[in-house]
UniProtKB/Swiss-Prot annotation:
Family, per entry: Belongs to the flagellar radial spoke RSP4/6 family.
Assembly, per entry: The radial spoke head is made of five different polypeptides (RSP1, RSP4, RSP6, RSP9, and RSP10).
Name of the protein in question: Flagellar radial spoke protein 4
Key words of the record: Cell projection, Cilium, Cilium biogenesis/degradation, Cytoplasm, Cytoskeleton, Flagellum
Stored CDD domains: DD_CrRSP4-like
Taxonomic lineage: Eukaryota, Viridiplantae, Chlorophyta, core chlorophytes, Chlorophyceae
GO annotation, cellular component aspect: motile cilium; radial spoke; radial spoke head
Biological process terms in GO annotation: cilium assembly; cilium movement involved in cell motility
Function comment: Flagellar radial spokes contribute to the regulation of dynein arm activity and thus the pattern of flagellar bending. They consist of a thin stalk, which is attached to the a subfiber of the outer doublet microtubule, and a bulbous head, which is attached to the stalk and appears to interact with the projections from the central pair of microtubules.
Amino acid sequence: MAAVDSVAQALAYLQVHSPQDGTSMYDHLVKLVSKVLEDQPKNAVDLLETSLLVKKSTFDPKESSPLVPIPVAPDATQTQAAVSIFGDPELPINPATGEPVPADPPNEFEAENMLGAAAVLDCLGVGLGRELGVNIALAAKRIGEDPKLAVRSVRFFGKFLGLYSDYFVFEVAFKKEAAKEAAPAAPAPERVEGEAASSSAPEVPVEEPGKGANKFTYLVCSSLGGPLTRLPDVTPAQVKASRRIKKLLTGRLTSHVSTYPAFPGNEANYLRALIARISAATVVAPSDLFSLNDETGELERAEDWEPPAGREMAAPTAWVHVRPHLKSQGRCEVHKRELPEDADEDEFYNEDELEEGPDLLAALEEDAQLPGEQAAWTPIYSSASEAVKTQAGGLRSLVWPGAVCGGRGSEWTCVYVGWGVKNAPFVPLPPPPVAQEFAWGEVETQELELKPAPPPPEEEAEADE
């Protein structure tokens, strides 16, 4: 009996897991014996290095990034956030009287019919479903009626999928720029040495808030009804850097974007750069619904617009772009340096400064084709039969998988639900050129000094005496 207890104690001791890597001596010995039996070396007892080899070659899943979303058990916080959108917000209590503080009148805002949009997408077999569409509409209503935010308009942009959690993105426009501070901002990234790559290209300024790529502000949350976070304005450097990398989102705004070339910011900045690119390429509207005001440059809605039939909405000619094109500079409006008086415009400006992109209200049929002469948009229908009277039609983007637009009657919408990865081949950048050891301009001369002539033999003899 004592022998059995001693064996059990020995096994228990060998099965104790290390706090560093989580392995045990028992598991290591099992792998070591399996390695020796598999290779069958001649002098197995002399190969003491096999133990170290087995330990070094063992795969550790903790060291690599997950390839699939990590299942997260729902907690009480997500449940409370989901329940909160179905009721009125809780009012603060006045400590003097013990009564709730009177609520401010709700803010007036503009928004699309999100329930009708969810029904259109549900008919086309895309989107997030009608049940989640109700929650999205209630969350957008909560944002729009908040008197502290004081938004002028709110629109559900879409949902970005992440490895640990997802992002629900709402596109808002504030009545006053100062009201933007009411929404908590995403934490600023920590500056890492060597993050900014040296480049001889001129620095491109950031577009002002309310213009170009920063015309709208984006609020994100991991669960509908949860706390909102305001994404920072996008910079041209971030847009250009995001075009050179492919990275899955983690669902954590403060995560470091570890890529080559280095991205100037954290995941909040990377998500904002993706939104700017996707918005410029996939936010569309039915043709003839808007007209461009030549004086103000803004879009005006037509009052006498007649929606086409459902299946006709599945044609690229039935949709137009309503967001300005994002140029190679990372801006919607090309920035040009000040031209010297004696300089030639064609020789002084580079290709990015001379770029001319498509104008507003350009039809989707004019979009660049994919390799193999494949169209950038493919049609989708609510029914394969043309005999069905009331149908919904739309288009699915092949450039940005997950971006769709659709309409049925007077109801239309466009939304993005995807991983934030563009359908384009990944072309890694070559390493940068070898840096110079020092600046040649600071060197006084590049010529070596001549060796002084040796003294005459007579002078050497006198010196010896």
